[in-house]
Amino acid sequence: MEFQSDLTREISPQRKLGRGKIEIKRIENTTNRQVTFCKRRNGLLKKAYELSVLCDAEVALIVFSSRGRLYEYANNSVKATIERYKKACSDSSNTGSIAEANAQYYQQEASKLRAQIGNLQNQNRNFLGESLAALNLRDLRNLEQKIEKGISKIRAKKNELLFAEIEYMQKREIDLHNNNQYLRAKIAETERSQQMNLMPGSSSYDLVPPQQSFDARNYLQVNGLQTNNHYPRQDQPPLQLV
């Protein structure tokens, strides 16, 4: 315990506060600057290597010292990585230019559409007899011709629909008339049947029309008004139905 307390007393106040932040600025001393460069360069190369291995990334590192000495690192090839970088920058610039061109094109098309919409709105107002102050005599004549042409087309279509409606109503009237006649005939037939059924002593023979009779021997109809000179006299009297 005494050794531990003595060790605690020997720790300086700076050690207790921990490592402070180092101010980032140019090192004026040449020797110190060179030493720092070597240390930081090695650390940077180590970090680049670790990044390429851990993350499977293509890394290229180029460093020039203050004296112009070159230091480089690449897990593949510095030249190949630089070419890939140039291509990526070119593609991104082309993509930006294409996007800009597309945006400009769509803006122009939108302007054209807005102009067309404005013209159509003005024409509609002119057809309604509004906003005529900006039209000259020629424009007014053209507008009048267009309106008259449109009115003639509207009238022709209206007459076509009216004629079709009249034709349909006429056919409908004929159908209704035929149905009415058929129903009247059915009603009259039903009334006659009911009257015949209500008559007393009615039988199947009552259905025979008047002024006609039946010859019981041969069931031939004989006119009651005709004489019997045309028929041979029968010796036997005719049968009578009871």
From Swiss-Prot:
Domain (MADS-box) ranges: 19-73
Keyword entries, A-Z: Activator, DNA-binding, Nucleus, Transcription, Transcription regulation
GO cellular component, as recorded: nucleus
Domain of life of the source: Eukaryota
Disulfide bridge positions per record: none
Annotated compartments: Nucleus
Any one biological process term the GO annotation gives: positive regulation of transcription by RNA polymerase II
Coiled-coil residues: none
Keyword Nucleotide-binding: no
The K-box domain, residue ranges: 103-193
Tissues expressing the protein: Expressed exclusively in stamens and carpels.
PROSITE patterns: K_BOX, MADS_BOX_1, MADS_BOX_2
GO molecular function: DNA-binding transcription factor activity; protein dimerization activity; RNA polymerase II transcription regulatory region sequence-specific DNA binding
InterPro entries from the UniProt entry: MADS-box/MEF2_TF, MEF2-like_N, TF_Kbox, TF_MADSbox, TF_MADSbox_sf
PANTHER family with a match to the protein in the record: SERUM RESPONSE FACTOR HOMOLOG
UniProt function note: Probable transcription factor involved in regulating genes that determines stamen and carpel development in wild-type flowers.
The name this protein goes by in its record: Floral homeotic protein AGAMOUS
Organism, as annotated: Petunia hybrida
